[in-house]
Amino acid sequence: MKILTFGEIMLRLKAPGHERFFQSPMLEATFGGGEANVAVSLANYGMDAEFLTVLPKNDIAECCIRELRYFGVDTKKIVRGEGRMGIYYLEGGANQLPSKVVYDRAYSSIALAKPGDIDWDKAFEGVAWFHITGITPAISESAMELSLESVQEAKKRNITVSCDLNYRKNLWKYGKKASEVMRELAKYVDVAIANEEDVQKSLEITVDVNVESGELDREKYRVLGNKVLESYPNMKCIAITLRESHSADWNGWAACLNDGKDFYVSKKYEIRDIIDRVGGGDSFAGGLIYGLNNYEDKQSALEFAVAASCLKHSVIGDFNRVSVSDVAKLMGGDGTGRVQR
């Protein structure tokens, strides 16, 4: 089955270790972006994964494409356009000092892209599953219009659409609230992925959940999922990640899935000494897409997604460099971290 993900991939510039920005005169350069991260996860699991974006014609973009190809992601559908490559700067947190992200995405190639710039007949050729996030619609008004066009074109072709709502308050700067856009985009989504804040800010659907407290009441998430599915009858299910933030490097991690009939809750992992949590949600999304297409029951699909994401917290960089067997071992209870010989 061919899976296409669509969004922006950026140059990631990170302060070394747990240093503050420019504490030393260097930044570690890699690449990353929500939808690209999902494509890499799926390729690592042996799925036929393609990534679609708009990139400039320069050497940095070429290096980015080569990096994706290294992981087995098909990049043939990437469109070249005007503009620049987006950048994000990352400062890794520790203990009570949170991680910090600074975006530099204005006038990037995908921010300048508009409806009509992508040949959707070509893009969706052979595709059975399409994945997008709420990040691309936040970048610019034209990128928002292109995102809406993408899901509309996908549904015309009866392609399954998954969307990670991914609310990013610092990106919505062109005059529209996230909910104005995402409530429309959600009408074309089959599988929704979110955390509690995403649902509240992107869909304006709430229950009495304190998103800042770090404490979880799972019954309220059942109600929250029900409200989303009642509001969007097109959705087949919604998965909600459950993160308890004790500190920047100690999180509790679990998820639930609601398909309107049954409510599934995963095992909870206590993740201590987090190495890099950026991309953790994307690794969950990639794991869920894999799980829903490779397991007969939704509980196993959910457990795979949560275990995959748990492992990502110990992997440096945006991409989740783990295999199906790595995830399966953790699902099976092998989480000791002992040397495997």
Please place each PLM-identified region on the residue numbering:
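Hydrophobic beta-strand scaffold residues
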Residues: 49, 75, 161-162, 193
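A short helix->loop->beta-strand "cap" motif at the edges of active sites that frequently abuts
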Residues: 153-160, 232-236
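Glycine-rich phosphate/adenosyl-contacting loop at the front of the ribokinase-like
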Residues: 1-73, 94-96, 113-115, 273-275, ...
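Conserved phosphate/ATP/ADP-binding segment of small-molecule kinases
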Residues: 171-261
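Conserved post-catalytic alpha-helical subdomain immediately downstream of the catalytic base
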Residues: 264-334
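Short beta-strand/loop segments at the ligand-binding rim of alpha/beta enzyme cores
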Residues: 158-165, 171
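Conserved N-terminal subdomain of the carbohydrate kinase-like
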Residues: 48-135, 327-341
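Acidic-glycine-rich active-site phosphate/pyrophosphate-binding loop
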Residues: 4-19, 251-267
